[in-house]
Amino acid sequence: MIKLGFHVSIAGSLPLAVSRAQEAGCDTFQIFTRSPRVWAAKPIEPSIAEAFIDALNISGIGPVVDHMPYLPNPAAEKPEIYARSIFTMTEELDRCDQLKIPYLVTHLGHHGKEDGHKKGQEKVIAAIGQALDESEGETMILLENTANEKNTVGGTFTDIGVISDALSNERRVGFCFDTCHAAAAGYDLKGHGAETVFGWFNDEAGSLDRLKVIHLNDMKGGVGSHLDRHEHLGLGYLGEETIHDVLTFPKISHCAFIMETPSDEIRTDKDNLAVARRLAV
């Protein structure tokens, strides 16, 4: 049976995220280990890390996925932003190791006008390579596809393949596939189907064996819109048939399926989870 869950809040304390995941009925979940909107991160006290790990072990939920905060840009043109981005990625890998979190999802950033795309790729490769070399533990960095907005790195499967192929520490580099981002970038999951689109990903980005997380999101925009706006499952362009197609595609059944859908007056997280469970059979 596939594992389904959400991005959950750590408000109050890290161990409370486990309680929230349990309350929502999650099999797996994603967090930020810190505020995603600032550079500075308060160190995780050993007692807090121990409480988080204990709560997780008791819950039976897993794997847990961490997401990089918003400010780092591993393709940054400005040297000070680039250096801080590498430091933050290294720090976040160490925080994952402290919390026994196996996966850290990262976007690949935006390159500057002067640098151009190829230079942006080279910076991302160097940044991730340095972070892996300088961090402790075995946490994997998962490269996430984007909606291919202007100047982004990682907006095409080929782009992700260039990054992953250049990183020699392959055992600690994997993938996160976002369904909304893929379709917004022009990969029509609705029109071509999961088997075809994930086949392209396998051929151009890397083996599906290295795909560890699916961000299962419907979308407010259409194919090729480059609009990164998530919608409730089945209520956006992709629709229930496409979500079912993704959830039942055998070659990705080993992945953790994380929803980053809205929680509002239309649907709660529990409502979206019920839809996902219905569409997974």
UniProtKB/Swiss-Prot annotation:
GO biological process: base-excision repair
Domain of life (superkingdom): Archaea
UniProt enzyme class: hydrolase
Protein residues bound to Zn(2+) 2: 144, 178, 215, 260
Cofactor comment text: Binds 3 Zn(2+) ions.
Keywords of the record: DNA damage, DNA repair, Endonuclease, Hydrolase, Metal-binding, Nuclease, Zinc
Keyword Membrane appears in the UniProt entry: no
Gene field: nfo
InterPro entries given in the database record: AP_endonuc_2 (IPR001719), AP_endonuc_F2_Zn_BS (IPR018246), Xyl_isomerase-like_sf (IPR036237), Xyl_isomerase-like_TIM-brl (IPR013022)
Protein name, entry field: Probable endonuclease 4
Annotated Zn(2+) 1 binding sites: 67, 107, 144
Phylogenetic lineage: Archaea, Methanobacteriati, Methanobacteriota, Stenosarchaea group, Methanomicrobia
Entries under Pfam families matching the protein: AP_endonuc_2
UniProt GO MF annotations: deoxyribonuclease IV (phage-T4-induced) activity; DNA binding; DNA-(apurinic or apyrimidinic site) endonuclease activity; phosphoric diester hydrolase activity; zinc ion binding
Known role: Endonuclease IV plays a role in DNA repair. It cleaves phosphodiester bonds at apurinic or apyrimidinic (AP) sites, generating a 3'-hydroxyl group and a 5'-terminal sugar phosphate.
